[in-house]
């Protein structure tokens, strides 16, 4: 169980309309606003669900997926604009939860005895990895007996045209890379060595457990009510699970991996920024710039005319070569300013005016 408690930090969120109502010279000045707000705390109870498959082995493999999602978006995180709608979260993360159940059924029928299996369905992931963070602080088995943690988060949107699967955490054990590459089968694997990331494997990595996170990529329906079951690639999910099974079978006979700390490429030298453009980047894109996989309605990008499939090449005076330079450019933007956004669209360079 995890009971969330409120902090003593006051938080204020301003809508674009609220910002527009402020004096134009307010930002950058030393003026102060007096605010009167009423705060109502809501306590919720969330539960992790665990199943232990005891094979009488000294070490245990953890397979995990988070089963929570956004509900009606009342706790934040939704990219939907308009009347509240239920967010079913088919890809994020019913796909991973279904994969967890399928693997539990599969291994229950096998005679694998090198290690035990612990199947974990986490809650509270969308609110900040709460379920997995709680588990590693209150584990039901010694963490030093864990072989590795495999995390399935958004495995339901494999593209048939590329069959590209993201595997994160490949730098957390010396043994990972040869296995990840050689066992790919029909899949094209895009690796990320970092053990950190915005999913539950991070909680285990921070406890010196080797991890792998399986991820088929972002899409326009991410954190929207349209993330529904009819948009999942079920044959693709099967390919992902078969790949995970091959990896499990290839684990060392003694059930020990050489854990390694990794460079946190996601957070290293990341600039702080106050603004958002309102795009969903294509994290599998390997070319110049930042490819747009989705555009959030009502945000600056959408209002400027940015389209899904565009590739961002420049923002104001900044050149955008990759995600790092994009974030640097975003950090250099100012509220209320209008700048030129350069995108590549269907082979041509298009200049748009975006206002923050």
Question: What do these predicted ranges mean?
Answer:
Residues 204, 296-310, 329:
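PDZ/PDZ-like domain micro-motif
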Residues 98, 105, 109, 220-266:
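His/Asp/Glu-rich mid-to-C-terminal helical/loop segments that flank catalytic regions of hydrolases
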Residues 63, 100, 119, 279, ...:
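Terminal peptide-recognition signature
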Residues 303-323:
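Conserved PDZ fold ligand-binding element
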Residues 114-122, 149-152, 251-271:
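Acidic/histidine-enriched alpha-helical segments
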